[in-house]
Amino acid sequence: MSDSVILALGIAAFTVIVLVLVAIILFAKSKLVDSGDITIDINDDPEKAITLPAGGKLLGALASKGIFVSSACGGGGSCGQCIVKVKNGGGEILPTELSHINKREAKEGYRLACQVNVKGNMEVELPEEIFGVKKWECTVISNDNKATFIKELKLAIPEGEEVPFRAGGYIQIEAEPHVVNYKDFDIPEEYHEDWDKYDLWRYVSKVDEHIIRAYSMASYPEEKGIIMLNVRIATPPPRQPDAPPGQMSSYIWSLKAGDKVTISGPFGEFFAKETDAEMVFIGGGAGMAPMRSHIFDQLKRLHSKRKMSFWYGARSKREIFYQEDFDQLQAENPNFVWHVALSDALPEDNWTGYTGFIHNVLYENYLKNHEAPEDCEYYMCGPPVMNAAVIKMLKDLGVEDENILLDDFGG
C-alpha cells in the first residue's frame, strides 16, 4: 500500500473521529445546556406569565422582565431574602438554600430565587407587593458626613415619579464595575482623627462585577421626591487590616452631587404595628436610618399620640446626628422623648448624659421600673452585638417575639 493511500486513510479516519466527537458534544449540549424559550407562570394569572430564553437563575429571569425580587446580597445566596414558592419546575433544592429554608418550607416548594436554575417551564408564586417594585435612575443631591464613618446620601427621584414606600422600608442600590480610592473621599477635618489613626486613606475598593445591596431608608413618606440613606463605610477591622473593604459602601461614599445612581424598590417588612401600644425605639450607628423614618412618620405624618421613646447609642459626642431634629420633635410632642448614651465619651465632650451600652442604659433607666415592659413594642436597628444584647434583655423581661421587631440592615 502506497504512502499516499495510507495518508489518505489516516486523514479520513481522523475526520470521522472528529465528526463523531462533535456529534457527541452537540448531543450532550442539547441535553445539558439550556436552550429555546420557556414560560414561567406566575400566581396562576395568565397576564403575569413571562416567556424568555432558558438559562440563568430565576432571580435574574424575573428581573429581566421587570419583576424585582428583594436580594440584599445581589444574588449570592447569603441574605436569604429572595424566597419564592416554586410550584413546578426548578429542580431539587440545593444545599446552599437550606440555611435559609427549613424542611417544612422546602417540602412546600419554597426556594431562593437566586439559586433556582431556569431550564424549563415553571410555575411560581410571588407576593403581590412585588409587582409594585420599580427601578429608577436617581441623581445625587448631596452625600455628607454625619459621623466619622456614616454619610447621609440624599437622592432625587426623577421628576414626576415617586417611590411609594412605607416607613421602615428599604431600597436596593446598584453599582457597575468600578474602582474607588479612599484617598479621594471628601471627609470634613473634624472626622479625620480615626481615619488618620488607622490610615484608612490607603484602601482601594476594586469591583469587577455588577453588584446590588439593600439599605434602609432614613427618609419618611412625606419627604417627597427624595430618598435618604445613612451609609456606614465598611472598612476592614483593625485586627484584619488586609481584608477588603465593603464594596457597596465604598462606592456610595465615592458619590458626588450630580452623579447618577440606579435604585429599585420599595421593599420591606419592618413596619410599625397599627396598635395603641407604647413604642420603644433602640438604635445605634447607621441603624439610625429606619428609626428616623419611623419616628418622623409617627409624629409628623400620622400625628400619633402613642407613647414613644428613642434610645440611641453612640461612641462619642461627634457620632450623634439629627440631634436638632429629635430635640425639636421632643419639644413639640409631649408623648415623645429621646435619649443618647455614649459608650466611649471623650474628655472634650464634657458629657453629662447617659454613658455605657444602650441596652444597659435602657434597662437601668427605664425598663427596670416599667409597670409592664412586656406590653410595649420594641423597634430596633443597630450593630449585631447591640441587637443581640437588646433582644436578650427583652427576653429576660418576658417580652414575646411578636413585640420585638428587628431591622437587620442598619448596623
UniProtKB/Swiss-Prot annotation:
Membrane topology: Single-pass membrane protein
Any single biological process term in GO: sodium ion transport
Protein family (similarity comment): Belongs to the NqrF family.
Keyword line: 2Fe-2S, Cell inner membrane, Cell membrane, FAD, Flavoprotein, Ion transport, Iron, Iron-sulfur, Membrane, Metal-binding, NAD, Sodium, Sodium transport, Translocase, Transmembrane, Transmembrane helix, Transport, Ubiquinone
Compartments in which it is found: Cell inner membrane
Chief location bin: membrane
Quaternary context: Composed of six subunits; NqrA, NqrB, NqrC, NqrD, NqrE and NqrF.
UniProt keyword Kinase, yes or no: no
Reaction(s) catalysed by this chain's protein: a ubiquinone + n Na(+)(in) + NADH + H(+) = a ubiquinol + n Na(+)(out) + NAD(+)
GO cellular component entries: plasma membrane
EC numbers on record: 7.2.1.1
Protein name listed in UniProt: Na(+)-translocating NADH-quinone reductase subunit F
Function field: NQR complex catalyzes the reduction of ubiquinone-1 to ubiquinol by two successive reactions, coupled with the transport of Na(+) ions from the cytoplasm to the periplasm. The first step is catalyzed by NqrF, which accepts electrons from NADH and reduces ubiquinone-1 to ubisemiquinone by a one-electron transfer pathway.
Gene Ontology molecular function, alphabetical: 2 iron, 2 sulfur cluster binding; electron transfer activity; metal ion binding; oxidoreductase activity, acting on NAD(P)H, quinone or similar compound as acceptor
Listed transmembrane segments: 5-25
Cofactor binding notes: Binds 1 [2Fe-2S] cluster.
Organism: Haemophilus influenzae (strain ATCC 51907 / DSM 11121 / KW20 / Rd)
Entry binding sites for [2Fe-2S] cluster: 73, 79, 82, 114
Domain FAD-binding FR-type: 133-273
PANTHER family: NA(+)-TRANSLOCATING NADH-QUINONE REDUCTASE SUBUNIT, NAD(P)H-FLAVIN REDUCTASE
Cofactor(s) needed for function: [2Fe-2S] cluster; FAD
Ranges of residues in domain 2Fe-2S ferredoxin-type: 36-130
Catalytic: region residues: 276-393
Cell inner membrane listed as a keyword: yes
